[in-house]
């Protein structure tokens, strides 16, 4: 991500800037595919595919950094505005089908729309507060890492708690994982060729974020395989009983 305007970049980075831009574009492709896939799966399975709090945090981030504190780069603006547009569809299907997943908690089920609204507003205030504290350029990066961590943990917890794979798929997992993974080479390019303004990328916290993302999101694919195998075994056992 452009923590400092590209106009301040050294000549050696400008020579490889197209590679960093390609990574950003691939990120947009991955996440756009994920959003479209989530909308389709939500309608097909009549559920939602991303845990409630991470979904609201991610949507709030896109509202803040696509509309309120937009990026300097024209390409980054386009990527995030496009992502926000598709994410509106994800939010709509989540609000529409979420009640079906909360029959065990009637109080939550009855007030889900207000819970979504309050959660988005709360996360927007958090993103804006961090921007006021660190400055928008640095805050958008750190808050994006925080969103990713919440998405990774929330996805694992949701899959474990539900015990079924409705609302998700290998394609949804891979598109999300790939969309975030391709930003790591971009960060490496910035650190290697534009180190003066990207020293923070060697900080323990940044390295921890990257490591925990790889562990958690990689684990999701394994857990999804296990849950699907369990579903198949359960279905086969039920069929044998009927015979």
UniProtKB/Swiss-Prot annotation:
Pathway assignment: Secondary metabolite biosynthesis; terpenoid biosynthesis
UniProt GO molecular function: lyase activity
UniProt keyword Magnesium present: no
Residue intervals passing through the bilayer: 13-33, 51-71, 78-98, 112-132, 141-161, 169-189, 207-227
A Gene Ontology biological process term: terpenoid biosynthetic process
Signal sequence interval, chain numbering: none
Membrane disposition: Multi-pass membrane protein
UniProt keyword annotations, A-Z: Lyase, Membrane, Transmembrane, Transmembrane helix
EC code(s) of this entry: 4.2.3.-
Application of this enzyme or protein: Diterpenoid pyrones display various biological activities and FDDP C shows anti-cancer and anti-HIV activities. FDDP C also shows inhibitory activity of 42-mer-amyloid beta aggregation that is involved in the pathogenesis of Alzheimer's disease.
Cellular compartments per GO CC: membrane
Coiled-coil ranges from the UniProt annotation: none
Taxonomic superkingdom: Eukaryota
Localization terms from the record: Membrane
Family named by the database record: Belongs to the paxB family.
Matches recorded under PANTHER family: PTHR42038, TERPENE CYCLASE AUSL
Physiological role: Terpene cyclase; part of the gene cluster that mediates the biosynthesis of diterpenoid pyrones. The first step of the pathway is the synthesis of the alpha-pyrone moiety by the polyketide synthase dpmpA via condensation of one acetyl-CoA starter unit with 3 malonyl-CoA units and 2 methylations. The alpha-pyrone is then combined with geranylgeranyl pyrophosphate (GGPP) formed by the GGPP synthase dpmpD through the action of the prenyltransferase dpmpC to yield a linear alpha-pyrone diterpenoid.
Name listed for the protein in its UniProt record: Terpene cyclase dpmpB
Organism: Macrophomina phaseolina (strain MS6) (Charcoal rot fungus)
